[in-house]
């Protein structure tokens, strides 16, 4: 299956820890489970028009959840922490908000 840049990057992670890392030009995204580091790097550079220095990925296993006697499982996920170069501009997630 051929993944486009918009298929690879699912959504940004907006937590207190990830917001603090943005000061060091480190941005966290939920990415497609089958995407590798080079695909994530290419996708971030294309979508946000920045230069990527480094990509770290974390595979997360979905939790098992119960509702009464029914047992289900949440989907597995992959998180990517993308470090930008010093000369790159910052990625603004909240441009349109007032």
Curated annotation (Swiss-Prot):
GO molecular function terms listed in the Swiss-Prot or TrEMBL record: rRNA binding; structural constituent of ribosome
Biological processes annotated in GO: translation
Matches recorded under InterPro entries: Nucleotide-bd_a/b_plait_sf (IPR012677), Ribosomal_uL23-like (IPR013025), Ribosomal_uL23/eL15/eS24_sf (IPR012678), Ribosomal_uL23_CS (IPR001014)
Lineage top rank: taxon: Bacteria
Keyword field: Ribonucleoprotein, Ribosomal protein, RNA-binding, rRNA-binding
Cellular-component GO terms for this entry: ribonucleoprotein complex; ribosome
Gene3D superfamilies hit by this protein: 3.30.70.330
Assembly and interaction partners: Part of the 50S ribosomal subunit. Contacts protein L29, and trigger factor when it is bound to the ribosome.
NCBIfam families (alphabetical): PRK05738.2-4
Family: Belongs to the universal ribosomal protein uL23 family.
Biological function: One of the early assembly proteins it binds 23S rRNA. One of the proteins that surrounds the polypeptide exit tunnel on the outside of the ribosome. Forms the main docking site for trigger factor binding to the ribosome.
Name of this chain's protein: Large ribosomal subunit protein uL23
Organism: Clostridium botulinum (strain Alaska E43 / Type E3)
Native organism taxonomy: Bacteria, Bacillati, Bacillota, Clostridia, Eubacteriales
